[in-house]
UniProtKB/Swiss-Prot annotation:
Protein name as annotated: Endogenous retrovirus group V member 2 Env polyprotein
Ranges facing Cytoplasmic side: 343-456
Keywords tagged on the record: ERV, Glycoprotein, Membrane, Signal, Transmembrane, Transmembrane helix, Transposable element
Location of this chain's protein in the cell: Membrane
Xref: SUPFAM superfamilies: Virus ectodomain
Sites where a glycan is attached: 68
Gene for this chain: ERVV-2
Keyword Cell inner membrane applies: no
GO CC entries: membrane
Residue intervals annotated with topology Extracellular: 22-321, 478-535
Length: 535
């Protein structure tokens, strides 16, 4: 129904208004600018899933970081006032530091009783009719309506012996055995035999705070670990340990993520903490020790699943197929990786968190004068505003719609392109890719289209194979041939002197060379010997 009204609203808008829209105030454009500038992106597409709920962007719990909180005293007013915004909470595989703003206690085997107002019934003694429980004395506002259980006892002067008892939300140390025109709820056996509850904040009973204040909070996430040290935890715990109203706020970019009331501590029949499905959290920029209970952590904004996917592309036609392949790989990774195949820097996450929080603040401020339930209304208006921004971006031509995603183009200078004609020109390959559905077949077709035709190469396949084999094994055969020839030559030189000595010993006898003396360097002795031999 909400989407129909949005489309009707857009259809009635004049086109010049859409073309002259202030894109700097558009949430889709703002998110894209933060992602592009924080990660130095250029010449690519940033695709967002269409937002129909604010949980399309979710908050992640942060592990190790330094955080400087802002502290203040007094009744929180203005920007320090806590107005919750329910957001989706990312599943964390790591333990994160969390803090119980108020300590839990076990209600089992505790003495507890509250009063029933019976004076209006003109009764001087018990019992009070069932259902006439004095809410001002029996429960805190915001807790479920107390269930009245009958309980039998026989105090003197009270007939019949039936009274009623409301389960206590917080323990009291006093006991009044003289009701005097009131029915007292005495200690007895509950239908729920045991349960764990959060204590009320220390400054909850401050006189200047409205009595109808709803205590907010519950368990946050299974990833929470109370034992992990963190500087902000000790500071916040020490600051809130006071009966004086105090508040604390996160720096820009960070938020408090606190457990909602729908998450329950253990009770009879459910020995473990129960969490909502899907996991949600209450987002605050400021919390106080007046109304906040339960478990809180600090977090940042991140995309949900593959809510944001980065597609790389290039301008030249010959490289377009390569961009298509990269896009397919990015989409394939995005289906597996929790961050859409893209790494977000800490600065980017803080800026995204700050932007979404600014939108939430302006949304809450715009409806602050309404007397309706501001918590649920803030979420509805927030959803509608984000959805409207996305639809305005689509109608204005700033984003190209592909596969149910709204894609904005980051130009060569790293800025979000707002020229409709340029966006249309650059979106040609994106639409072609979208028709393929980022499937393996589409990627393979892109690879084949990028390669030239192989028909002309078939006749050359045989010679090319021979040449390839020669290149591979030719050096080995050449080295082997060289070694073989060198070995034969060496053997030939070693046998030659032996043959000469053998021939000389056969031609002349032993007496033939008896007058030969060793040669000197000039050969003179050899010539003299030969002359004597000739004589």
């Amino acid at each position: 129904m909400t989407e129909k009204f949005l489309f009707l609203y857009l259809s009635l808008l004049p086109m010049p208004l859409l073309s002259q829209a202030q894109w700097n105030e558009n949430s889709l454009v703002s998110f894209s600018k933060i992602i592009a500038s924080g990660n130095h992106l250029s010449n690519c597409w940033i695709c967002h899933n269409f937002i129909t709920r604010s949980s399309s962007y979710q908050y992640i719990l942060v592990r190790n970081f330094s955080l400087n909180l802002t502290f203040g005293s007094g009744i929180p007013e203005g920007q320090h006032k806590s107005v919750p915004l329910q957001v989706s909470l990312a599943n964390s595989a790591h333990q994160v530091p969390c803090l119980d703003l108020t300590p839990p206690f076990n209600q089992s085997s505790k003495t507890s009783f509250y009063f029933y107002n019976c004076s209006s019934l003109n009764q001087t003694c018990c019992p009070c009719p069932e259902g006439h429980c004095d809410r001002k004395n029996t429960s805190e506002e915001g807790f479920p309506s107390p269930t009245i259980h009958p309980m039998s006892f026989s105090p003197a002067g009270c007939h019949p012996n039936l009274t009623h008892w409301c389960p206590a939300k917080q323990m009291n140390d006093y006991r009044d055995k003289s009701p005097q025109n009131r029915c007292a709820a005495w200690e007895g056996k509950e239908l729920i035999t045991w349960r764990v509850l959060y204590s009320l904040p220390k400054a909850h009973t401050v006189p200047t705070w409205p009595k109808s204040t709803v205590p907010l909070g519950g368990p946050l996430s299974p990833a929470c670990n109370q034992t992990i040290p963190a500087g902000w935890k000790s500071q916040l715990h020490k600051w809130f340990d006071s009966h004086i109203p105090r508040w604390a706020c996160t720096p820009p970019g960070y938020v408090f993520l606190c457990g909602p009331q729908k998450n329950k501590l253990p009770f009879d029949g459910s020995p473990k903490i129960t969490y909502s499905t899907p996991p949600v959290a209450n987002l605050y920029t400021c919390i106080n020790n007046i109304q906040h209970t339960g478990e809180c952590a600090v977090g940042l904004l991140g995309p949900r699943g593959i809510g944001v996917t980065i597609y790389n592309t290039t301008q030249p036609r010959q490289k377009r197929a390569l961009g298509l392949i990269l896009a397919g790989m990015g989409a394939a990774i995005g289906m597996i990786a929790p961050w859409g195949g893209f790494t977000y820097h800490d600065v980017t996450l803080r800026n995204l968190s700050r932007q979404i929080d600014n939108i939430a603040k302006s949304t809450r401020d715009s409806i602050s004068k309404l007397k309706a339930s501001i918590d649920s209304l803030a979420n509805v208006v927030m959803d509608n505003r984000l959805a409207l921004d996305y639809l305005l971006a689509e109608q204005g031509g700033v984003c190209a719609v592909i596969n149910k995603s709204c894609c904005v183009y980051v130009n060569n200078s790293g800025a979000i392109e707002e020229d409709i004609k340029k966006i249309y020109d650059e979106a040609t390959w994106l639409h072609d890719f979208g028709k393929g559905g980022a499937s393996a077949r589409a990627i393979w077709e892109a690879v084949k289209s990028a390669l030239p035709s192989l028909n002309w190469f078939v006749p050359l396949l045989g010679p090319a194979t021979v040449i390839l084999l020669l290149f591979l094994f030719g050096p080995c055969f050449f080295n082997l041939l060289i070694k073989c020839v060198s070995s034969r030559i060496k053997q030939f030189h070693m046998k030659s002197p032996q043959m000469e000595r053998y021939q000389l010993s056969v031609i002349g006898g032993p007496s033939t060379y008896k007058h030969i003396s060793p040669l000197d360097a000039s050969g003179q002795r050899f010539r003299e010997t030969m002359e004597e031999f000739s004589l």
